[in-house]
Each structure stands twice: as structure tokens, then as C-alpha cells.
Amino acid sequence: MFADSAVACVISALRAVGVDSPLMSELVPRLLFVHAHPDDETLTTGGTIAHYVRRGADVRVVTCTLGEEGEVIGEQYAQLAVDHADQLGGYRIAELTAALAALGVDAPHFLGGPGHWRDSGMADTPARHQPRFVDADMAEAAGLLAAILDDFRPHVVVTYDPDGGYGHPDHVQTHRVTTAAVERAQWQVPKFYWTVMSRSGMGDAFAVARDVPEEWLQVSVDDVPFLYTDDRIDAVVDVSDSIEAKVAAMRAHATQISVAANGQSCALSNNIAMPIPGVEHYVLVSGAPGPRDARGWETDLLAGVNLA
């Protein structure tokens, strides 16, 4: 059984001194994160990604669009936006590549290939370009992701909850596609999680965040509408050992994320200050839970997974 990533740590140490074998490759834990746009992987699961990479796991990130419809922070690259040159998507490939490198992941993977589906924009924005991901044929999209599951055979799959975290159409569609792919794939995914934000965890992070830039709008945890209460959460990953990697990845997404000088908070194009917590939370959708702590939470997404 897999406990606290101990097997991965041993394998990583052996590989560091030149010892490798097909059996070792089979024993390496594999985690797949499915996200809607470049930067989502970092904002919601960046600490977890870096945490497991540090422990020798094989981690892959699948991104469903290039984020072409995103707003751009600052003047330097503002004309890349959809209303000007419409070159933001290509630029965000470079940002995603740099962010993944900061997290320890080799390269991005795009569902259907880069640009196969376009960012749908928010629900109230016009459909200026097709094909939008929100309109993707479910059989095609889920089939492509199921093929990735069958090839990679992840022990853990992570995506959004049915509301897409905060309601973005592409996040909701990513949830639907991933859920359908997990059901369709021949590979039986041992554990399937939603990434969620904890009210208590964010409250703790708000309480300790300091030196927030004056130009950012400061809010409280009560102003954040999409948080989960503790009784709805199944797992927490302490990412304090990987927070520097997460902050570096955030800074790589410079057209989308501003990061405070001290790395304790960030803001998107809305300039609303949000703390960067040292924990990331999850809901277990399918699979057997591993050992739980006093709160009733797993502290390792791989807990209880048999790698053999």
C-alpha cells in the first residue's frame, strides 16, 4: 500500500544515483490533473502538483483550451487580447510551459492538441469564435481524455466540482468531460477527486496575509462565495513544502496573475487580493478513502492506493 509517498521517495532516491528498472516505473504513482485554461493548474492545484513531483510521482496536466478569451494584466502584452491581435492563446502556451517547469512537470498536454477547442469566455460574453469548448461534442472530448487515461493509467485524477469552482463555462465543461472520461476509460481510476477551496483554510490564509499591495481591493473570507465548509471536504494536502514553486508558477502566468512581493497573496485582472494558502483541499468522488485524520480528512491523495 502507498503511505505518505514513501515508495516514490525511495524510487526518486534510487534514480538519483542511476538505479532504474521497468518494475520501478510500474511502482511510481501517477496523478493526472485536468484543467480548463493555462493558470488554473497553478491557482487551484499548483502546490499539490509540486508536492507530489517532489516525492517522485509522475504528474501530468491536461489543459482543455489556450485561454484565448482571458483579460490581460498590464500594458506590455495588452494588445495580445482577443479584441486586438487575438494572439493571447499562443502566448499563454509559453506561460503554461514555464509554470509547469516551476512545478516540476515536463511539458503541457492539450486536449485534442493546442487550439483544438477555444476558450468559451464567461457566460455573459459573446461567442466570437468557434469551436468553443463549452460546445464541444461530449463523445469526442471524453473519448480523447479517456484515451489519455488508458495510456497514462493514473492512480489519481483531479478536476473541478460540478459548478466548475466558480461557474466559468469551461470549468463546468471540464468537469463534465472528465467525469465522462473516467466512466468511459478502460483503465479503472483508483481515486477521482474534485479540487475545491476550503472556507476554514482560506480564512486562516486571510488572517496571516501581510503587505497586500495598496492598489488591490481587500476583501474577507465572507466575500468569497464558492468555498466549501469542512464537513464537505474529504482530503487536504499540506503544500507548505512546495509553496515557493507554486508562487514561481503564478509569476510565470504574468498576463493573468499578479503576485505580491512577499508571495503571500495574489490578484487576477479584477485586482481583488486573495491569499495564497499553504493547504489545498479536495472532495473524493470515487474510490476507497485512505486513513483519515481527526478532522475526517485524508492527508495524502494516494493514501490506500495499491501501486502494484
From Swiss-Prot:
Chain positions recorded as Zn(2+) binding sites: H37, D40, H171
Keywords from the named record: Hydrolase, Metal-binding, Zinc
Broadest EC class assigned to this enzyme: hydrolase
Lineage top rank: taxon: Bacteria
Alphabetized GO MF terms: N-acetylglucosaminylinositol deacetylase activity; zinc ion binding
Necessary cofactors: Zn(2+)
Keyword rRNA-binding: no
Leader sequence residues: none
Function (record text): Catalyzes the deacetylation of 1D-myo-inositol 2-acetamido-2-deoxy-alpha-D-glucopyranoside (GlcNAc-Ins) in the mycothiol biosynthesis pathway.
NCBIfam families for the chain: mycothiol_MshB (TIGR03445)
Originating species: Mycobacterium sp. (strain KMS)
GO BP annotations listed: mycothiol biosynthetic process
Catalytic reactions on record: 1D-myo-inositol 2-acetamido-2-deoxy-alpha-D-glucopyranoside + H2O = 1D-myo-inositol 2-amino-2-deoxy-alpha-D-glucopyranoside + acetate
InterPro entries in alphabetical order: GlcNAc_PI_deacetylase-related (IPR003737), LmbE-like_dom_sf (IPR024078), Mycothiol_biosynthesis_MshB (IPR017810)
Co-factor note (free text): Binds 1 zinc ion per subunit.
Keyword Heme recorded: no
EC numbers: 3.5.1.103
Family membership noted in the UniProt record: Belongs to the MshB deacetylase family.
SUPFAM superfamilies on file: LmbE-like (SSF102588)
Name of this protein: 1D-myo-inositol 2-acetamido-2-deoxy-alpha-D-glucopyranoside deacetylase
